[in-house]
Amino acid sequence: MKKYLLLVCALSCIVFAKAKDWTQYVNPLMGSQSSFELSTGNTYPAIARPWGMNFWTPQTGKMGDGWQYTYTANKIRGFKQTHQPSPWINDYGQFSIMPVVGKPEFNEEKRASWFAHKGETATPYYYKVYLAEHDVVTEMAPTERAVLFRFTFPENDHSYVVVDAFDKGSYIKVIPDGNKIIGYTTRNSGGVPENFKNYFIIEFDKPFTYKATVANGNLQENVTEQTTEHAGAIIGFQTHKGEQVHARIASSFISFEQAALN
């Protein structure tokens, strides 16, 4: 009887342990109030699955800045796929996505939006923020090799999503028939193979009414493909108040075909 009671107690403990949500104790923003001059952790909000291939983070720092998110910043310029272990080592294979309204702005300073921490929710598996400049709520939830974005737009005839493949060699292609953007980035900080590329595929659930690509800061409407030092794309559509547009993003260091499988 005594052994039976001990077994019941042990099983009860196992069930309790499995049911407990330990993520409620995790604050991904902790340690992010850091800078080149002073570290309080040198972390960034890494929104990711355990052992995920990619992390996703809101980006407050400039392209190439190792301090890609700092708690004291007041503007977000994109939502970035990252593999960065520390600001000193920096990143590799990064690219970003950003919703904007009004004008199709690619420049990272001009597309940036004010935000406040009271409008921000950060957990290990989900991130949400209100972008005041554009009146857009952005949400993201990652899988092991992909991520799902949800953008809640205002009523606007000129709602856009910017895709920035970053500099140091990149490629982008808009595929309107498939509501899709594909591309690759070669940006890295060393320690990668000579043929290094991070291939990505982005699928939207809303047809495009506007399309443009960007080559080294030069926006070209109705041009759907660029291979250059710094490539990007902007797609757009009309939205009604509260309309939600979803974007599924997957990537691979092997090929576009593998990214589609991921």
Q: What are these language model-derived features?
A:
Residues 20-262:
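Accessory carbohydrate-recognition regions in carbohydrate-active enzymes
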Residues 1-20:
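Bacterial Sec-dependent N-terminal signal peptides
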